[in-house]
């Protein structure tokens, strides 16, 4: 099977770069599966997992939004934040989840609910990917 080059980049620098058989992820418009030769496109990404299928394994990268650029032989993911499953600090993600849940449970008027919901979604995504629940 032909491969496609994938780069995952954040403002802090590159996170992942490799040749893979298939890239699948969730964009704002729905689930995308990308193989070599895919038509060029750009799509905004949701907080979620990028699944990178190789011949004998699947690697996971947690992304916190961003954009996906597809060319026939290359996929570039420009993410606000990204971590491979192996790089995720589970204790830190669990703490972030607890903080977000506490903010959402708080009855204070100064809590930014939308921001707390996004923080919770990011933390849960990181935990799911670290435990390979995809």
Curated annotation (Swiss-Prot):
Transmembrane segments: none annotated. One of its GO terms (cellular component) is plasma membrane. Its main location: membrane. Keywords: ATP synthesis, Cell membrane, CF(1), Hydrogen ion transport, Ion transport, Membrane, Transport. SUPFAM superfamilies: Epsilon subunit of F1F0-ATP synthase C-terminal domain, Epsilon subunit of F1F0-ATP synthase N-terminal domain. Produces ATP from ADP in the presence of a proton gradient across the membrane. F-type ATPases have 2 components, CF(1) - the catalytic core - and CF(0) - the membrane proton channel. CF(1) has five subunits: alpha(3), beta(3), gamma(1), delta(1), epsilon(1). CF(0) has three main subunits: a, b and c. Belongs to the ATPase epsilon chain family. This is ATP synthase epsilon chain. It comes from Priestia megaterium (strain ATCC 12872 / QMB1551) (Bacillus megaterium).
């Amino acid at each position: 099977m032909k491969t496609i080059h994938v780069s995952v980049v954040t403002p802090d620098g590159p996170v992942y770069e490799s040749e893979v058989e298939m890239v699948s992820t969730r964009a704002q418009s729905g689930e995308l599966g990308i193989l070599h030769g895919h038509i060029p496109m750009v799509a905004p990404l949701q907080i979620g997992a990028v699944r990178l299928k190789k011949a004998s394994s699947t690697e996971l990268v947690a992304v916190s939004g961003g954009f996906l650029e597809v060319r026939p032989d290359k996929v570039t993911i420009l993410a606000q934040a990204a971590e491979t499953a192996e790089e995720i600090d589970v204790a830190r993600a669990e703490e972030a989840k607890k903080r977000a849940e506490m903010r959402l449970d708080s009855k204070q008027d100064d809590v930014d609910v939308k921001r707390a919901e996004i923080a919770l979604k990011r933390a849960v995504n990181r935990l799911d990917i670290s435990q390979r629940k995809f």
